[in-house]
Amino acid sequence: MNSRTVWHFAYGSNMNRAQMLSRAGKILEEHNASLPNYEVRFNKKVRGGTAGANIQPSSGKTVHGVLYKIEEGAMRSLDRYEGVPEHYRRIEVQVTPEGGQTVPAQIYIASRIEKGLRPSPNYLQAILDGAGEHNLPASYIGELKTAAGAA
């Protein structure tokens, strides 16, 4: 049986490989990648009044993250975990893997945003661990800390 696959671009805690495996079950491929003209914001309200990661358009900025190739069923599992459509909506964007050609990928964008939020220390650490695990640029990791109010 030949399952259909999809590319998913992770920019938050799903960059953490162990977490992504626990949610998707299986990763077929993974690559560092970038999404131009967007930036990460911590403006998605989650339980406890803390912030979840979100992205929004921002000319000249770049979001670095991890591009995962997964089966469609795994994407549906992620949708359930992320709370689509109540908490996040899934859209398609064009991302560029390191050293590769641009590909269409699925991402999550917060359905509702709120200003003045900060991520919990554990959540931020999961993001930073994933960024470090994939050797994302140190300057970008600094941008994540600044966006989280932790710099």
Where are these regions (language model features)?
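Glycine-aromatic micro-motifs
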Residues: 1-151
